[in-house]
Structures are given as C-alpha cells and as structure tokens.
C-alpha cells in the first residue's frame, strides 16, 4: 500500500530539487533521484538521460559550463496530475506508487565571458514524478529554451 505525500512535503521535495540545482553540486542533486535503472532527467523533446549515474555526469558537466544558476518565481502545483494531463504512456510509467506534480520557475544562468558575466533567464516548466515511499525523483522533465543557454555558452568561448 502506498501513502499520500502531504502537500507541505511535496513542496519541500520540489524546493529541494531547485536548491540542489542552484548549489551546482552534482552529488547533492543526484542523491535526490531514486537509484533505479529507469530513473530519468529529460529536457524538452530530447531523449531522456537515464540512470542516476548518467544524470550526475550530465549535471557535473553543466555545472562546469555555467558560473551560477539561481531559480526564482517558483510555483508548485501539488495536486497529482491525471492521465489526461501527463501522458501515462511516456516513460517512466506513472503508477499508484508515484505522484506527479508540476512546477514553473525562472532559472537564471550566469555564464562567464570575455566581458564579464552574461545572465540568461529562461522561463521553465518542470514535471516531477516522485516515488511515494522514498520521496525521491523517478523522473524530472524540464521544458525551457535550452538552445538560448547553449548559444550564450558558445558566444562566451
């Protein structure tokens, strides 16, 4: 039997994700994910990054690329989403052992360049699927214009 995660706990879990990203500590961030072979991190329609180890490696590389990340204007919808909102046929499968919540935020990425630091703010929506028992992330799907971040990084080199 699975238990319901109280709203305050869901907010704390999602906020801990943003705090971990902002800390730019790949170990801290990866520790929030469920250590399962199907755990994913995905951006937009790109193929998902699968396994905690791969998520940690990707995060470490991202954190070396940018000077800082700061999330603001965070909104979290804690009512579990139904199958008609989040497609249930997308991996990983949603089940009674998970809860899915949505959040919007404004992450600001700072990139060092020859003239100092450039900041790029990218409005984002994230879908978090959380394991009810462990309160760890099974899946995080971030949607924002990541091409703008890559363009800013490219122009800084």
What role is predicted for each listed range?
Residues 1-35, 41:
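Short, low-complexity N-terminal intrinsically disordered segments enriched in polar/charged residues
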Residues 14-17, 29, 55, 76, ...:
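Hydrophobic beta-strand residues in large extracellular and virion-surface proteins
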Residues 17, 58, 106-108:
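A ubiquitous structural signal for well-ordered alpha-helices
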Residues 26-104:
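A solvent-exposed, acidic/Ser-Thr-rich amphipathic alpha-helical stretch
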Residues 33, 105-109, 144:
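Short beta-strand segments enriched in hydrophobic/aromatic residues
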Residues 64-68, 107-121, 149-150:
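Short, cysteine-centered beta-strand-loop-beta hairpins and adjacent loop/turn segments enriched
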Residues 96-98, 121-157:
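Short beta-strand edge/turn micro-motifs at domain boundaries
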